[in-house]
Amino acid sequence: MTRVINLDGESLTLEDVIAIARQGVACRIDDSAIEAVNASRKIVDDIVSEKRVVYGVTTGFGSLCNVSISPEDTVQLQENLIRTHASGFGDPLPEDAVRAIMLIRINSLVKGYSGIRLSTIEKLLELLNKGVHPYIPEKGSLGASGDLAPLAHMVLPMLGLGKAYYKGELLSGQEALDKAGIDKISLAAKEGLALINGTTVLTAIGALATYDAIQLLKLSDLAGALSLEVHNGITSPFEENLHTIRPQSGQLATARNIRNLLEGSQNTTVATQSRVQDPYTLRCMPQIHGASKDSIAYVKSKVDIEINSVTDNPIICKDGHVISGGNFHGEPMAQSFDFLGIAISEIGNVSERRVERLVNSQLSKLPSFLVKYPGLNSGFMITQYACASLASENKVLAHPASVDSIPSCENQEDFVSMGTTAARKAFEILKNSRRIVATEIMAACQALDLKPENHELGKGTKVAYDLFRKEVNFIEHDKHIEIYDELNKASAVIEDPSFLEAVEQAVELSIQF
């Protein structure tokens, strides 16, 4: 039976977002939402017929809020809004981000506080389910008043305007509709504003980054466990008793993950008089990785709220009361996604340091740069440089966007969130850190193969090693490989959900205790 996710504005989960955005799962408007949507629309129709002054319905926008609009111009006002606000720059957002944007906007609108017609929401839903993906430039949003520019680009194809992708082909908006068998629409009063005024773009990008960060946290524990086995690491820093007296949830979870991954390993040791402690990057994984786990768990809690929230303005209350407020302001998510970027950056930082320990013969007691006949062969020498480059780039990207603001719209919108910049930066940091972690896993597997004694790996690390080696080759000599290709294979392995799923079938991994 084909899976369909119901959208009621209340129960959308991050996992649902991933299913619809990346796996193409269909969705529908839940019957429970229809009455509220229709009631909200009737209130807007009454406002227009009664010539009441309501922002964005019978007035202009932004600093033009005191300019009255006649009833006969309320429809043209909405189309003008979309045409002029579609002012984005840069490369198009990827398909999964666009689908997440469409989904989250629909889920917000079905709560029934935006005064939009049910048929208009259904049109956006039809585009999503039929795979018509608007061309949305990645840059141009201040994160308040919502994501105006990118969301206006989302709306253009609904009107037969703009550009959209359909079955991988970039077409005019009208061509995409025609090929998908979809009729264009005209907007009614309030509808343009309802579609573009909200935190949807920054939330969608940040939600995808948050989901991927959760997976990366588990992969970083795996990478660290493999590195620990290379160094015959001391296991006492992961004993539960140590962490229950400082019961930070992420710290407890990391220690448990490492214990689970290393269960049965013959490549670990205990502290002795000659070797009392391991370096921080190995010994302090629970504290370092755990801090990022706690941060990202907090961010996920904010995402869970935001994807089920109304971020429109004005709000049409069920009793007919209209409130002009600021739910479109992205500050809560801007700060959250800045926090996300910092947390992911630290994962990349510590992983890069472990890569250095693996390739450094003085620290690993293995051949320099993890290759036979170093000198003739350079092995992983420049691979570590590349990781250092990504880690250093992350340190620049981790500077918070939310501490910046530029007044706009004749100083009416005088403090903005820069939340979309924060979300985009967090995703870039995520991609960089994921490459570093993939490199650590690749280097650790290479190091394990170079060790003179081939001891049994841990319960979880053995599964990971075996799967990894099916795709990524041992590097015998420089002349036989192009390491760039192997690095790309390594990244592809860890980005494939089946890799982590297989490890988690063998051992339990979590980000919270």
Swiss-Prot record:
The modification 2,3-didehydroalanine (Ser) is found at S145. Keywords: Cytoplasm, Histidine metabolism, Lyase. There is a cross-link at A144-G146 (5-imidazolinone (Ala-Gly)). Disulfide bonds: none annotated. One of its GO terms (molecular function) is histidine ammonia-lyase activity. Its main location: cytoplasm. InterPro entries: Aromatic_Lyase, Fumarase/histidase_N, HutH, L-Aspartase-like, Phe/His_NH3-lyase_AS. The keyword Nucleus does not apply. Its EC number is 4.3.1.3. The keyword Transferase does not apply. GO terms for biological process: L-histidine catabolic process to glutamate and formamide; L-histidine catabolic process to glutamate and formate. Pathway: Amino-acid degradation; L-histidine degradation into L-glutamate; N-formimidoyl-L-glutamate from L-histidine: step 1/3. It catalyses: L-histidine = trans-urocanate + NH4(+). It is found in: Cytoplasm. Belongs to the PAL/histidase family. This is Histidine ammonia-lyase. It comes from Streptococcus pyogenes serotype M18 (strain MGAS8232). The lineage of its organism: Bacteria, Bacillati, Bacillota, Bacilli, Lactobacillales. The gene is hutH.
